[in-house]
Amino acid sequence: MLSDSFQFICDAQKHKARHLKPIDETKQIFLHSANQKDYLCGMKLDKRFQIHSNSLDPKQGDILISEPLMNDFHFGRSVVLLVDHSEADGTFGVIVNKQLDVSVNQLVDDFPDFDAPIYLGGPVAEDQIFFMHTLGNLIPDACKIMEGLYWGGDNKTLDTLIATGIANEDNVRFFLGYSGWESGQLVGELVRNSWLVSHVSTDRLLTTTPSKMWETYVNNLGKDYEMWKRFPMNAEDN
């Protein structure tokens, strides 16, 4: 049985997510990017790259910072916001630092005039668009993630807020797909030091340049993680 908040979010995915236009050949290439390998690098971590303390239990509103050796199309050098987490029921999140070179207007039929970018949310439900925002109760059925940050809600209300200029690129973000873990799966990845659990404020999350987010948040971890930034994104380049 899912927790109440997790069930609400899962129901929202089924009933409130926007589906993409039929995907033409160009978008098909875009979505699957050269069939890059989806696997975690099997290299044994040098002590300089290991997570020194990973005892912080993940919770709703936390972020996951991927370790530098993770070689995965979606999760390599990623920062994942945990929209909801339950030890019993699993984890739901979105990648927040991978902005795509496509706007929501290009992918969703009958969308208001809103040339906002879309972010790669994760490998699950990549035929659907989701959104988070700072508009709170202005959007009915929105689910609070943390102070000042909300997930989803009524699409028609969002359209109205966009048309009136209340909703804009500064307070709404769209995601293609999402990231999910079954019960115990994320904990297992934390034990294997695949992720570091941290936390940032809503303002920090929304104002950090996406392409610099992983490096910026690693900087905040201190000198113990200095080597993370020096490791090449492709180990074969080293």
Indicate where each model-derived feature is located:
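Low-complexity, glycine/proline/serine-enriched flexible coil segments
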Residues: Q13-K14
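Short, positively charged and aromatic/hydrophobic N-terminal segments
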Residues: L31-H32, D38-Y39
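A short aromatic-anchored loop/beta-hairpin motif
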Residues: G42-F175, S179-N238
